[in-house]
């Protein structure tokens, strides 16, 4: 039985990465705030790229402060996708239901905006984490109902601290041996 505002988090550690998945974390204000802070802290010192699918531009300001937008890419004849380069990932996950899917990509400073737009990173983030090109990505899928974060194992301790914080808030955190992206 699921109680009001109860948050469940599953995570997996493998040889290349650490992953966590949660559903409806935005319904618990404290847990959502911790996730927002984790994503912002994780973005410091990294290049941040954002992809929104079926995200009306007028809703961008609900997800993050539009002052953090450094660049925007318009893809000709594609009204469904929006690509942004951000100065940081200070976001509000409570408004990710504005889009069918949203993803935040975290890179080191060697990757530039043009390289990001020209690669298949969007469709194969796990491959690029394994190759060391992508540090991490955060996905909001199913109109903000499910959240997925995967990063290089180099950042394992950051994720474990985040998970311990959620546990202290009363969230149910469980390590599992198998966890795959739910919408591949």
Where do the PLM segments sit?
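Structured alpha/beta or helical-core interaction and ligand-binding surfaces enriched in interleaved
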Residues: 1-184
């Amino acid at each position: 039985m699921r109680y009001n505002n109860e948050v469940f988090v599953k995570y997996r550690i493998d040889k290349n990465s650490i992953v966590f998945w949660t559903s409806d974390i935005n319904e618990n204000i404290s847990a959502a705030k911790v996730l927002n802070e984790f994503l912002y802290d994780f973005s410091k010192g990294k290049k941040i790229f954002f992809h929104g699918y079926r995200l009306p531009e007028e809703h961008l300001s609900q997800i993050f402060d539009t002052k953090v937008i450094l660049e925007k890419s318009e893809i000709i004849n594609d009204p469904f996708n929006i690509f942004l380069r951000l100065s940081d990932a200070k976001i509000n996950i409570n408004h990710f239901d504005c889009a069918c899917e949203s993803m935040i990509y975290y890179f080191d400073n060697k990757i530039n905006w043009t390289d990001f737009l020209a690669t298949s990173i969007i469709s194969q983030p796990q491959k690029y984490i394994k190759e060391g090109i992508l540090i991490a990505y955060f996905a909001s899928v199913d109109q903000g109902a499910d959240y997925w974060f995967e990063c290089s194992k180099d950042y394992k301790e950051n994720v474990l601290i985040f998970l311990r914080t959620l546990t202290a808030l009363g969230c149910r955190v469980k390590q599992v041996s198998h966890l795959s992206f739910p919408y591949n």
